[in-house]
Amino acid sequence: MNEDLFTPFTTPTVLGLPAAILVILFPPLLVPTSKHFINNRLITTQQWLIRLTLKQMMITHNTKGRTWSLMLTSLIIFIASTNLLGLFPYSFTPTTQLSMNLAMAIPLWASTVAMGLRFKAKISLAHLLPQGTPTPLIPMLIIIETISLFIQPLALAVRLTANITAGHLLMHLIGSATLTMLTINLPLTLITLTILTLLTILEIAVALIQAYVFTLLVSLYLHDNS
């Protein structure tokens, strides 16, 4: 089908409604509230998952590190919600953009490093030189450790971008193959449709796991500097 110059700017619709409205209305469903004294199963399960995740990340932190609990909880919920919303048709996943992931990773990483330099500067600087290093290797190891320190936010952002983008590309390719095979070979279409369904389930798991991994690594950086 031929497209004009303004096709990329056309607002996508679902059942006659702008997709943006549906995307905006979806996040409140992830944080339901109950008017009853006793919460229902959905809210109870959600609160249990948040407490479990927070416990896993905060169990090794001291008092200063635990002040980040609200920040880390908000971060994992934001990334998980963004990844899951990107799996909907006619939607866009911001976490596939390296610029956005860098915008999240660099300030968080810089905050942990600044916290370490403020409260325990000697220990933080000591990480640049492993104990027992031979004297001739000291300059080289300091340079290597410094480079590895500055690569941490880049690794955070690239890991999230690559995993989310790869999954979306696979879903797009298999989905296109399913539509192509629909008029050619019905049994093969059923096979590709089954693969697409399994891949979608896998991508839901990847969306949640990548949110947890990103937040957990930030938590580990915080633990090293608090």
UniProtKB/Swiss-Prot annotation:
Superkingdom field: Eukaryota
Protein role: Subunit a, of the mitochondrial membrane ATP synthase complex (F(1)F(0) ATP synthase or Complex V) that produces ATP from ADP in the presence of a proton gradient across the membrane which is generated by electron transport complexes of the respiratory chain. ATP synthase complex consist of a soluble F(1) head domain - the catalytic core - and a membrane F(1) domain - the membrane proton channel. These two domains are linked by a central stalk rotating inside the F(1) region and a stationary peripheral stalk.
Membrane-related topology note: Multi-pass membrane protein
Protein name per UniProt: ATP synthase F(0) complex subunit a
Originating organism: Pongo pygmaeus (Bornean orangutan)
Effect ascribed to mutating residue 4 to N: In strain: Isolate Anna
Keywords: ATP synthesis, CF(0), Hydrogen ion transport, Ion transport, Membrane, Mitochondrion, Mitochondrion inner membrane, Transmembrane, Transmembrane helix, Transport
Disulfide partners: none
Similarity comment: Belongs to the ATPase A chain family.
InterPro entries, alphabetized: ATP_synth_F0_asu, ATP_synth_F0_asu_AS, ATP_synth_F0_asu_bact/mt, F0_ATP_A_sf
